Amino acid sequence: MYKVVVIIALLGAVRGLDKICLGHHAVANGTIVKTLTNVQEEVTNATETVESTSLNRLCMKGRSYKDLGNCHPIGMLIGTPACDLHLTGTWDTLIERKNAIAYCYPGTTINEGALRQKIMESGGISKTSTGFAYGSSINSAGTTKACMRNGGDSFYAEVKWLVSKDKGQNFPQTTNTYRNTDTAEHLIIWGIHHPSSTQEKNDLYGTQSLSISVGSSTYQNNFVPVVRARPQVNGQSGRIDFHWTLVQPGDNITFSHNGGRIAPSRVSKLVGRGLGIQSEASIDNGCESKCFWRGGSINTKLPFQNLSPRTVGQCPKYVNKKSLMLATGMRNVPEIMQGRGLFGAIAGFIENGWEGMVDGWYGFRHQNAQGTGQAADYKSTQAAIDQITGKLNRLIEKTNTEFESIESEFSEIEHQIGNVINWTKDSITDIWTYQAELLVAMENQHTIDMADSEMLNLYERVRKQLRQNAEEDGKGCFEIYHTCDDSCMESIRNNTYDHSQYREEALLNRLNINSVKLSSGYKDIILWFSFGASCFVLLAAVMGLVFFCLKNGNMQCTICI
């Protein structure tokens, strides 16, 4: 009986060892992120990398902008009446509106999209006269009711409609040459008039067959006006097709024709670089922005956005994803609430995280004769935070490097195979989205691995300090074989623990405890032996009581056969 009491007392001594545990921060509800190895990894903290909101206005503070209003960019070159206030000028931001007017007399511009893009990317337009002169039999001031100006018939301001001076007279063969004496390329635009009927053609240019030829060192083309009836637009059944080319410095361009030509009055020089915005958003001179789209301004520091693939300025890359969460915390292991027994409230990082530790990523919990305590480890926490800080900026840098390479490759493809813009843009978006997902997943994997590594480094630091003075329990804790008060615990935390100071006490306690430790097999035998002995003692006591009662006549036993 005494042996059993001693064993129980010594086992209680084992359980009563001072204890220090290492753990990491945890939260009740973490955030799910994607890593290279797990698409549903829960972390303590994460930040969104995809911007989904914008300001519904154009922030123009600090910008020299030109709002074209009803004027279409093409109208700036040909001189549409709606563009009379925008024929020249400089800007850093050009704003195009949805219902802008490009043409008064109905028509179109060949390769209009490319020309419009050149204008929208420019930082201004200056004009130079072509110096073309015409004979006395040519009227260079043709007008139309479709292009009203100051209440009267007019025409495009930057080109001249050349017609016969006398109605029905054959237009004379005419040749004009423009030489670019500038050091920059000039953009020259001209038109071909397609009459609505033979009568109109004869009245304007005579009965002869019409032909226009245009040539420079880089451009050659011949045009024949097409006479046919067309639906009326602005009261006109005729059409004007505008053509354009770039004249290099020192080059000449020659026009030769006998009617049907809309001649340039001035050539344009696109100067500088600027932003071109297509938007119906109102202008706000009180806010700043570096990125714009049709819905307004995107003011964000995030590397990605899912608002539109068509943005201008210094913008986040478009990805076809609602969300890409970037881990800024460690793997989350919610705390398992345990009973408050002797060690019920203390468990290390191997078992679970600690939700109560809000002042650090890593820390300690201890229990000794003075009670329990908890403290963060600022060194390991700071080491982890230093690697997290700037992660978003590093992601942006990686994004820009990867995406600029992709964009360059696709720009070259566009240049080589022509008008495949929509196809290439869709392909770029798909690749950007894949690259974005991969980059974020890689960063998340690195963050989690790094956080785990810092936890293990801290654990190893404590293990090396304690040496044989403590034993690991397999749950992220150390059971200490000597008395360790609060100052002792503090020395372990701040890495100043003196192993030799407690060596003798720890060794003695270890020997005393180990001498009574039993293997699991012997423990089972003792338990069964104890159970059997208890049953035997109980049975003996009962039988003794029965015999005592029978002897004293207090109990009778009758046996019937």
UniProtKB/Swiss-Prot annotation:
The chain crosses the membrane at residues 525-545. One of its GO terms (biological process) is clathrin-dependent endocytosis of virus by host cell. Its main location: virion. Major glycoprotein, comprises over 80% of the envelope proteins present in virus particle. The extent of infection into host organism is determined by HA. Influenza viruses bud from the apical surface of polarized epithelial cells (e.g. bronchial epithelial cells) into lumen of lungs and are therefore usually pneumotropic. The reason is that HA is cleaved by tryptase clara which is restricted to lungs. However, HAs of H5 and H7 pantropic avian viruses subtypes can be cleaved by furin and subtilisin-type enzymes, allowing the virus to grow in other organs than lungs. Residues 17-524 are extracellular. The keyword Secreted does not apply. It is a single-pass type I membrane protein. Keywords: Clathrin- and caveolin-independent endocytosis of virus by host, Clathrin-mediated endocytosis of virus by host, Disulfide bond, Fusion of virus membrane with host endosomal membrane, Fusion of virus membrane with host membrane, Glycoprotein, Hemagglutinin, Host cell membrane, Host membrane, Host-virus interaction, Lipoprotein, Membrane, Palmitate, Signal, Transmembrane, Transmembrane helix, Viral attachment to host cell, Viral envelope protein, Viral penetration into host cytoplasm, Virion, Virus endocytosis by host, Virus entry into host cell. A lipid is attached at residues 557, 560 (S-palmitoyl cysteine). It comes from Influenza A virus (strain A/Chicken/Germany/n/1949 H10N7). This is Hemagglutinin. It is found in: Virion membrane; Host apical cell membrane. GO terms for molecular function: host cell surface receptor binding. Disulfide bonds join 21-477, 59-287, 71-83, 104-147, 291-315, 484-488. Palmitoylated. In natural infection, inactive HA is matured into HA1 and HA2 outside the cell by one or more trypsin-like, arginine-specific endoprotease secreted by the bronchial epithelial cells. One identified protease that may be involved in this process is secreted in lungs by club cells. Binds to sialic acid-containing receptors on the cell surface, bringing about the attachment of the virus particle to the cell. This attachment induces virion internalization of about two third of the virus particles through clathrin-dependent endocytosis and about one third through a clathrin- and caveolin-independent pathway. Plays a major role in the determination of host range restriction and virulence. Class I viral fusion protein. SUPFAM superfamilies: Influenza hemagglutinin (stalk), Viral protein domain.
